[in-house]
Amino acid sequence: MTTVEAPTGAALNTTWQNAPTHTINAGGVQFAYRQLGPSTGVPVVFLTHLAAVLDNWDPRVVDGIAAKHRVITFDNRGAGASSGATPRTIEEMARDAVTFIRALGFDQVDLFGFSMGGMIAQLIAQEEPQLVRKMILAGTGPAGGEGIDKVTRISYQDTARGLLTRRDPKEFLFFTRTPNGRGAAKDFLARLEERTNDRDKAISVRSFRAQLKAIHRWGQQAPADLASVRQPVLVVNGERDRMVPTQNSVDLDRRLPDSRLVLYPDAGHGGVFQFHEDFVKRALEFL
């Protein structure tokens, strides 16, 4: 993977498949990131899921939102092409994200957090409320949420299942095993391979384990007072999320003062990828 320091005032690419990878030094970490879409307006910062690097974002979702908004994605500390040791708490990851955002010179952003990224987004909104304008939380849950402390077991089980069946574990973790779910998984994984040049580094086993510990701790924490989150929030999930149980999305919607909830039928953790066309439409209407 080739990374370059981002030039000031660089033109933004509007295709995720060809968006160049840049780096920026912030807080002693060299963060790898990509950006595309319009050069003006409030940017949407994407916060990644467990074990994810830049190339794990669905091109249809990125390009869809980038059609109207500047999109910025980055590798968490210690993941992919970003330097440093992977944090073992969601709190540290949230601080890293704020450091990265401020290093790019932004005073206000929108956040799209998927799974672990949604946990990070919640903390940013609580700790740095002036930084966040709006927030999309997909396939995620609050601190102490139902079944979140079981993500480690489910992840290891489905990783082993993937090895035994020679399939990508995301087929089991993100999608239902119905005909619709299987078809959506196949299409999603094919889209992840559309970018052929300048691909990111896969996450290391050490980083993966550190992230699992962070999620486990999040699942065991005392519930936070989400009434303090005053920003508009779009909560999205599949009706059958077995990784971060769907009840957590319902709980978020109930506890957040200004939220709306979308649950996709016959869909699991990766509902936003299975129903990417509808999700992008709703996201653009919300942002």
Task: Give the label of every model feature segment.
Residues 264-280:
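Catalytic histidine-centered segment of alpha/beta-hydrolase-like enzymes
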Residues 242-248:
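Conserved alpha/beta-hydrolase "acid-adjacent" motif
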Residues 229, 235-237, 241:
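Short beta-strand/loop motif that positions the catalytic acidic residue
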